[in-house]
């Protein structure tokens, strides 16, 4: 019974990734229609990546459930070790292309804390239909004590390094903390902005329209390391401003799709991709499935 419940939730995480890549059109991003601003990946690359990651999603939630009473830092270390194996498997499946590195990190933490939370809330294990937004908040709060050390541990000693990873370079150049920053703050962009906005949208619109509007909203607020890496601070600010204007127009679904298709070409021309917004889109979908919003 327990394994079946945990499996069903890990499948919601996989489903969230499938929904994210399938949502179309997404400016600058890989979707069903085209590869956005990416020359090295396609819709099928994402499918390969998801299949590779899927067993690890199961491992994350089972680890959280099994070690729910463990010290937060010890649980974090277990999840990170699993996450590193998952990352290696992903890169093998995609021939070295980074499809889900940051999202895998976030999913490891959130599935791990979902498992730990469920171990402490047996009523949800017997009836997931009772899962509420309060449970979402509680799960995200569990991440913070696991990750409070991350910025100092991972990014605090970069002055001694000569070569940087993509995430480290963003921190050194711009102070952008990326997925580590989101995690160390308990995913507040997700809990305080993305999910409240989506709950409102889904109560007023059909699912596809709600998802497209959520994407636009996220592109208007997220500190997007992907955009900054590709185009710099000004390009990122420009995308945010454009998306704020698009939100204010309150377009019909048909006109919104047309506007996003047009903007897709703009971002392709500039080689810009809002990957940070895409990751938060998938994380929002995960909790939307748990809360039965979708």
From Swiss-Prot:
One of its GO terms (biological process) is prosthetic group biosynthetic process. Pfam families: CitG. Keywords: ATP-binding, Nucleotide-binding, Transferase. Its EC number is 2.4.2.52. GO terms for molecular function: ATP binding; triphosphoribosyl-dephospho-CoA synthase activity. It catalyses: 3'-dephospho-CoA + ATP = 2'-(5''-triphospho-alpha-D-ribosyl)-3'-dephospho-CoA + adenine. HAMAP family: CitG (MF_00397). Belongs to the CitG/MdcB family. This is Probable 2-(5''-triphosphoribosyl)-3'-dephosphocoenzyme-A synthase. It comes from Streptococcus pyogenes serotype M2 (strain MGAS10270).
